[in-house]
From Swiss-Prot:
<dbReference type="GO" id="GO:0006534">
    <property type="term" value="P:cysteine metabolic process"/>
</dbReference>
<comment type="function">
    <text>Catalyzes the removal of elemental sulfur and selenium atoms from L-cysteine, L-cystine, L-selenocysteine, and L-selenocystine to produce L-alanine.</text>
</comment>
<dbReference type="InterPro" id="IPR015422">
    <property type="entry name" value="PyrdxlP-dep_Trfase_small"/>
</dbReference>
<keyword id="KW-0663">Pyridoxal phosphate</keyword>
<dbReference type="Pfam" id="PF00266">
    <property type="entry name" value="Aminotran_5"/>
</dbReference>
<dbReference type="InterPro" id="IPR015421">
    <property type="entry name" value="PyrdxlP-dep_Trfase_major"/>
</dbReference>
<feature type="modified residue" description="N6-(pyridoxal phosphate)lysine">
    <location>
        <position position="229"/>
    </location>
</feature>
<comment type="similarity">
    <text>Belongs to the class-V pyridoxal-phosphate-dependent aminotransferase family. Csd subfamily.</text>
</comment>
<dbReference type="GO" id="GO:0030170">
    <property type="term" value="F:pyridoxal phosphate binding"/>
</dbReference>
<dbReference type="GO" id="GO:0031071">
    <property type="term" value="F:cysteine desulfurase activity"/>
</dbReference>
<feature type="active site" description="Cysteine persulfide intermediate">
    <location>
        <position position="368"/>
    </location>
</feature>
<protein>
    <recommendedName>
        <fullName>Probable cysteine desulfurase</fullName>
        <ecNumber>2.8.1.7</ecNumber>
    </recommendedName>
</protein>
<dbReference type="InterPro" id="IPR010970">
    <property type="entry name" value="Cys_dSase_SufS"/>
</dbReference>
<dbReference type="InterPro" id="IPR015424">
    <property type="entry name" value="PyrdxlP-dep_Trfase"/>
</dbReference>
<dbReference type="InterPro" id="IPR000192">
    <property type="entry name" value="Aminotrans_V_dom"/>
</dbReference>
<dbReference type="InterPro" id="IPR016454">
    <property type="entry name" value="Cysteine_dSase"/>
</dbReference>
<keyword id="KW-0808">Transferase</keyword>
Length: 413
């Protein structure tokens, strides 16, 4: 395998939160799938905004207002370029992936789904990409259908073709599973959806932090992701939507900035993208997200992918060697940097608590994916996930902690 081309030790220096001990041990943060850490470069632009040009945007003619507007709209352009969208109007800033998906479900879904229509999802989805479509189906008396998964938690092209048909109006799918690490072929699924006149809405929360995105090549109709999973601030997300679709959609939130004209009994809406950004927007957060994107681009997504793949394969092999561990999802060379597992006869929450005493942060629970837990025939799992600031030393620390946990819970008192 080709060597990655960045110095992880130099990267780690950019993350002050990692320079600490937890329970007397060096911190090994293996929970970036839930929330990533934030480099000083992003912290600095946030501080600079609040220190130098904190102001509201768009209508202010004073200097601070102009600087804030420039920062906010330049952030939009950074996102547009990052995902290779055609038009700046196609970039809507939201509170996060969940808000983005709900916007599509309510605005596009309510206007285009009718009784008897079908909405297609998978059992690997995060609740944020199941519940909005459940509720839409209930409101419209439509049918929610699930693409079957293979034994490894992947999608088979023939199953996709059999599930999507001329009744399908919306296909909603995760680009990468937050539990299994499955990487779905969004481009192919989009082609199949479009052949039947359906649109595709992609949950990209786990993909945007780790891979280069190209909306032209992928041909997704909607694509959603969050800043806090890709080194950015919390509270900021992005909805990409094709301009011709967004132009026909009605806003679902109303108030300041999103209006064109308001009379006593009626109102008209601003042009894209403003009509979907009611109220004071997420100014500092958008500026921080743009800096996070620039940080990742300086490292390079090819290098990021290679490094994460090396680390994931190493962790997978080391974990597989521990007797009593069950790992869920695709093989080690066909998954993103996520390993979800259970340790025999030890509850996942006990696993997470035990390894935390050794300074290792992993996630435990159903990971907002209860239908997937039912499919796996478990109530919950533990999950380790990897990012650009993780090392083999972090993995070794996890492995040692898991071995100690196994030994402790095997001890007969």
């Amino acid at each position: 395998m080709a060597e990655h081309s960045f110095d992880v030790n130099e990267v780690i220096k950019d993350f002050p939160i990692l320079d600490q001990k937890v329970n007397g041990k060096r911190l090994a943060y293996l929970d970036s799938t839930a929330t990533s850490q934030t480099p000083v470069q992003v912290l600095n632009v946030l501080e600079d905004y609040y220190k130098r040009y904190n102001s509201n945007v768009h209508r202010g003619v004073h200097t601070l207002g102009s600087l804030a507007t420039d920062g906010y709209e330049n952030a939009r352009e950074t996102v547009r370029r990052f995902i290779n969208a055609k038009y700046f109007e196609e970039i809507i800033f939201t509170r996060g992936t969940t808000a983005s998906i709900n916007l599509v479900a309510h605005s596009y879904g309510d206007a285009n789904v009718e009784e008897g229509d079908e909405i297609v999802v998978t059992e690997m989805e995060h609740h944020a990409n199941i519940v909005p479509w459940q509720q839409l189906a209930k409101r419209k008396n439509a049918t929610l259908k699930f693409i079957p998964m293979t034994a490894d938690g992947e999608l088979n092209i023939e199953d996709i073709k059999q599930t999507i048909n001329d009744k399908t109006k919306i296909v909603a799918i995760a680009h990468i599973s937050n539990v299994l690490g499955t990487i779905n072929d969004v481009k192919t699924i989009a082609e199949i959806a479009h052949q039947h006149g359906a649109i595709i809405s992609v949950d990209g929360a786990q993909a945007a932090p780790h891979m280069k995105l190209d909306m032209q090549e992928m041909n997704a109709d909607f694509y959603s992701f969050s800043g806090h999973k890709m080194l950015g601030p919390t509270g900021i997300g992005v909805l990409f939507g094709k301009r011709e679709l967004l132009q026909k959609m009605e806003p679902i939130e109303f108030g300041g900035d999103m209006i064109d004209f308001v009379s006593k009994y009626d109102a008209t809406w601003a042009d894209l993208p403003t009509k979907f950004e009611a109220g004071t927007p997420l100014i500092a957060q958008a500026i921080g997200l743009a800096e996070a994107i620039r940080y990742l681009e300086r490292i390079g997504f090819d290098a990021i992918h290679k490094y994460e793949q090396e680390l994931t394969i190493y962790a997978y092999e080391q974990m597989s060697a521990i007797e009593g561990i069950e790992i869920y999802g695709p093989p080690k060379d066909r998954r993103a940097g996520v390993i979800t597992f259970n340790l025999q006869d030890v509850h996942p929450h006990d696993v997470a608590t035990a390894v935390d005493t050794e300074g290792v942060a992993v996630r435990a629970g159903h990971h907002c994916a209860q239908p997937l837990m039912k499919w796996l025939n478990v109530s919950s799992t533990a999950r380790a996930s990897f990012y650009i600031y993780n090392t083999k030393e972090d993995v070794d620390q996890l492995i040692n902690a898991l071995k100690q946990t196994k030994e402790f819970f095997s001890y007969e008192f």
